[in-house]
A protein has these predicted regions:
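Aromatic-glycine hotspot motif
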Residues: 2-158
């Protein structure tokens, strides 16, 4: 088996709903996801999303966070360049940004201690960044309801 990343290929897992909306997960970058109106759009946006994710990890000193055996499950022979689809599954509910619904064969594998440790490190860095961002907000900004939602920024953060 060849490492698709070594071939310049990002492996993705696609969940597709009845309307054709897609959630596209980058297999070697747990938590890196693109939500799009269709598959072509999702696949076009994957390289930029992966680069942004990698930059974020590097800023927090976590560039090699996912260099663990469990994440190497994304390996297979590359038959595409750029973005390679590892798995495509139908999703029985509407896909909207932030609402993940796909369940992949990948998800059936038991979580390893290394994955749990890496995830906890990622969450700690995310929290630090969120708190640093919130400290720059003015008090009235904390009462905003993003996207016209039911909760304020402060309620979401708590």
């Amino acid at each position: 088996m060849e490492d698709m990343a070594a071939n310049g290929c990002l492996t993705v897992l696609l969940g597709v709903d009845d309307a054709g909306r897609v959630e596209a997960w980058v297999a070697e970058r747990p938590g890196c996801v693109v939500f799009a109106a269709g598959e072509d759009e999702a696949l076009r946006r994957i390289p930029a999303a992966a680069a942004e994710y990698d930059g974020w990890l590097a800023r927090w000193g976590l560039a090699r966070l996912w260099d663990i055996p469990a994440v190497a499950r994304a390996l297979r022979t590359a038959d595409q360049t750029g973005v390679c689809i590892l798995e495509r599954v139908p999703v029985g509910e509407s896909i909207v940004h932030g609402n993940t619904a796909a369940f992949f064969a990948w998800d059936q594998q038991p979580v390893t201690d290394d994955e749990i440790e890496a995830t906890l490190r990622l969450l700690a860095a995310s929290r630090r960044e969120l708190l640093a961002t919130l400290r720059r907000f003015q008090p009235d900004q904390l009462t905003l309801r993003p996207g016209g939602g039911a909760r304020t920024v402060e309620q979401i953060a708590r």
